[in-house]
Amino acid sequence: MAQGHYELKTAKDGQFMFNLIATNGQVILTSELYKTKAAAQNGIASVQKNGVDEKNFEFRMTKSDQPYFVLKATNHQEIGRSQYYSSQAAAQKGMESVMNNASTEVIKEI
């Protein structure tokens, strides 16, 4: 079965971040900024571990009533968050896509 991949990149300010990309090329999870590449790589490892378990996801709403979700580690720290969706059903599908792709070991540095 085809799986997505992680894109690890340097932000404009020199910090590091990553996206989890689905098989269709869509960004399905975006990390916070990390001061070091090693810290970002640890973040990816945390998504690989925690992103396969539905209990680690939390659904939220923006002020304009757009649903999105965050992925949390076992220590309750946020690891990544989704885009904003048009419906709760779409956000649910996004979460399922993260769960299906999180365990990929493919990391592309861009």
Residue ranges and their predicted role:
Residues 1-2, 53:
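Short Pro/Gly-enriched beta-strand edge/turn motifs at strand-loop
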Residues 2-4, 104:
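Charged, low-complexity amphipathic helices and coil/IDR segments
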Residues 7-9, 15-23, 28-34, 43-47, ...:
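A structural feature that tracks compact, well-ordered secondary-structure segments
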Residues 48-56, 99-108:
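Short arginine-rich
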